Amino acid sequence: MCTSLLVGKNATVDGSVICTQSSDCGNCDIRLEYVPAAVYQPGEMRVVKGWNVYDFLGTKGSPPVRSGPTITIPQVKQTYAYMATTFPFMNEHQVAIGEATLVGIRTELAPSENSDAKIRITDLSRIALERATTAREAINIMASLMEEHGFNAWNPNWMNLVPGGNDACGEYFAVADKDEVWCFEFLPVGSDWKKDSGEPGVCWCAMRIPDDMFAVNANESIIGEINLSDKDNFMASSNVKSLAIKHGWWDPKSGEPFRWDLAYTGKKANSLRTWRALSMVTPSQNLQPHADGYPMPIRPDKKLSILDIRKIHGDRLEGTEFDQTKGLAAGPFGSPNWPFGAPDQTRAIGTMSSDTIIINQCREWLPALIGGVMWVGLGGGDINLYVPFYAGITRLPKAYTTGVRTQFDWDSAFWVFELVGSWAQLNYVNMIKEIKAEQLRIESAELDRQAAIDEEAWKLYQEDPYLAREHLTNYCIENANEAVDSWRALANSLIAHYSFGTATTIEKFIAPEWWRKEISEKRK
């Protein structure tokens, strides 16, 4: 259950376009993958696999791959390099994608084994980044493939995403490039779709986020009214309205405008995560939780930075009535990671189930291989550390390509960050202060260096783009390795300092009085 943010270039402090994704599955792949560019011969085919959310490398000891249907499509002459985890996130032309599953769509749209629909999202988005040089092109590539071969959505019950929920879900991609960012939502078209029916195998709609606006997707549709005559800001499939009319979800004679969200989900986006993200960027609006929808996209009160975005992705509802660090479930030391099954448990943007969080930064004033930056955080947004990887790099640090979910590995970057996060649960209220201080120190230094790294890369690029790639690759590897070493040192310090509630100074961390009193009363 992911969260994705979209920010137009005039809503950021430096003119960057930003789109993000938190992979919150808790069992997705924890490694990064660099997929190089390639050239193909006429007549070659591209296998489209039915991967879901599991290990794409098939390393021994990994979770099993859950595959779906496989098809082949004609390969293109040239594919572009890109970076990925379970999902891809940016290519060498700084086309970027962030994903979130749409839950709660109409049950009649769920596909079945009788359907001819074959396309699933992991390889779909990879194909887009292999072939696209702009966001619009990426959307059209994906839409065309699904219209021809059908969108085969996975079942949220099968994935245990929504206990007691329905069997239908759709998908959302934030799709960005150096100039703009789009919200692209698409749905399956039912259990009986056939390829030879003459009907598209998907129902989709895309909305451009205005340059001075911000939006968030928290697993619910955020597209409302659409204006298909405004081709600069909207795109859609030919069945975008007819499918709703067919099922009785919208009547054009009613006088009511067509709303994508109401037609296909029956509601406007109003989750706690949606409210929290919007309220963090527009405190002046005084938005209230659980309203009947929110203005989306929205103009932020101030221009946003990378650090602002990382704060949103790490938010645990602190300072609100839903604060996860408060109350009996948080324990005496304020852990936001409540036990499963705790009453009144809320879902914050930050969560311990995050495998990776990617902040894609696209900048039009630089060549693509320099302008595109992927800020990668492994583990929960409150306890991880973001490191930059440029779009033009050709290699990755070993620590970021190592590790599986089923075995602790001190050489795996994910497990270093996960160890710090897990240990922090012993005394969160105190340890999180030390973690945040290290986050700010390292990430601020990375951002301070960015202009100098860009400038040197630009000088080398004018001489030979290969030299710029090597410069950026070496910097990213060195910086990432230093970051992991810093987090290993932090882990060593926290383990020694917070051992069974007693510090090496013999300072004891006593549970707060309110907690001791409440526990005492419950024992009576």
Q: How would you name each of these model-derived features?
A:
Residues M1, G165-D167, I349-D355:
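A short catalytic or substrate-binding loop motif that flags glycine-/basic-rich loops and adjacent residues
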Residues E443-K524:
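Histidine-centered catalytic/metal-binding microenvironments
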Residues P111-N114, L124-A132:
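Second-shell loop/turn segments in exported
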Residues T265, T274, S279-P343, R347-T351, ...:
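Accessory, solvent-exposed terminal regions and/or long lumenal/extracellular loops of proteins
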Residues F333-Q462:
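Substrate-recognition/cap regions that form aromatic- and gly/pro-loop-enriched pockets
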Residues C2-I121, I141-K303:
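A contiguous strand-loop segment
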